[in-house]
C-alpha cells in the first residue's frame, strides 16, 4: 500500500522535491478505468504526498470522463490550498461549467446529478 510500502521507501531516498502525476483515468466512472477507485481514495493518496511536506509539483494527466476528471482535479487543487474536497458542494459558477460539458460516451447520456452538484463521489 501507499502508506506502508511506497512512502517509507520514498522517505529513505530523501528527495528534494516530488513530481506527482495525478492522472484521473483510474477513477471508477472513467471509461478507460480498470482500477475503479473513488475520488476519496484519489484525494487520500494526494494528501499522503502533501503531508510529507516536501516541495511537490502536481501534474494532471489521463481522465476520459470530463465530469470526474474536473471534479477530481478541483479536489486536488483544494487540498493543495488547505481545503477539504471530501464534502464540497459545487458553487453555481462551477456547476454551470460542469453542466456545459459535452461527453460523447454512453456514460454521458444521462449524467448523475452528483457529477454537477459536488466534488466527492460518495461518503
Place the predicted regions along the sequence by residue.
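A general "terminal functional-core" signal
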Residues: 1-123
Amino acid at each position: 500500500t501507499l502508506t506502508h510500502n511506497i512512502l517509507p521507501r520514498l522517505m529513505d531516498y530523501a528527495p528534494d522535491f516530488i513530481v506527482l502525476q495525478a492522472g484521473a483515468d483510474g477513477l471508477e466512472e472513467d471509461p478507460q478505468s480498470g482500477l475503479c477507485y473513488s475520488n476519496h481514495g484519489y484525494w487520500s493518496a494526494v494528501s499522503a504526498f502533501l503531508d510529507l511536506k516536501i516541495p511537490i509539483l502536481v501534474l494532471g494527466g489521463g481522465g476520459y470522463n470530463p465530469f470526474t476528471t474536473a471534479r477530481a482535479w478541483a479536489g486536488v487543487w483544494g487540498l493543495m490550498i488547505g481545503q477539504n474536497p471530501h464534502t464540497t458542494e459545487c458553487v453555481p459558477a462551477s456547476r454551470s461549467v460542469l453542466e456545459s460539458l459535452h461527453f460523447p460516451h454512453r456514460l454521458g447520456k444521462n449524467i448523475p446529478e452528483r457529477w454537477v452538484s459536488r466534488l466527492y463521489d460518495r461518503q
